[in-house]
Amino acid sequence: MTKLKCKSLRGEKKDALQKKLDEQKTELATLRVSKVTGGAASKLSKIRVVRKNIARLLTVINQTQKQELRKFYADHKYKPIDLRLKKTRAIRRRLTAHELSLRSAKQQAKSRNQAVRKFAVKA
């Protein structure tokens, strides 16, 4: 089997990709059997290519699946954790802008009753 190109795989349907994946897996199994039974050197070098092809297929399948999920959850309020933006732990725990702007009743009364002082500089 020749090396698969991710560019050509991206346009294909999910079931076609799954079929190709199954073919690659069966080919890998036959190559491994031939390795144990003492197959030709050309078949042994093919194992690496087939393994990489399987990895490429799985990568394309997973990426398209995640892309579809991102489209689905785009207009939802809550998203699954793996689809959210990756932030640092500290940023995730930080107060939101709304939480920062909240004031207690006592603070609101103080700001209402006491005007902001204006200072003039004597020249």
Curated annotation (Swiss-Prot):
Instruction: List GO molecular-function terms, semicolon-separated.
Output: mRNA binding; structural constituent of ribosome
* One of the record's GO cellular component terms: cytosolic large ribosomal subunit
Name the Gene3D superfamilies for this protein.
1.10.287.310, 6.10.250.3450
- Which key words are in the record? Ribonucleoprotein, Ribosomal protein
**What SUPFAM superfamilies does the entry give?**
Ribosomal protein L29 (L29p) (SSF46561)
One family name in Pfam for this protein:
Ribosomal_L29
**InterPro entries assigned:** Ribosomal_uL29 (IPR001854), Ribosomal_uL29_CS (IPR018254), Ribosomal_uL29_euk (IPR045059), Ribosomal_uL29_sf (IPR036049)
Q: Which domain of life is it from?
A: Eukaryota
Q: Could you give a single Gene Ontology term from the biological process aspect?
A: maturation of LSU-rRNA from tricistronic rRNA transcript (SSU-rRNA, 5.8S rRNA, LSU-rRNA)
Q: Which NCBIfam families match?
A: L29
Query: Which family does this protein fall into?
Result: Belongs to the universal ribosomal protein uL29 family.
UniProt name for this protein: Large ribosomal subunit protein uL29
Where is the organism placed in the taxonomic lineage, from the top?
Eukaryota, Metazoa, Ecdysozoa, Nematoda, Chromadorea
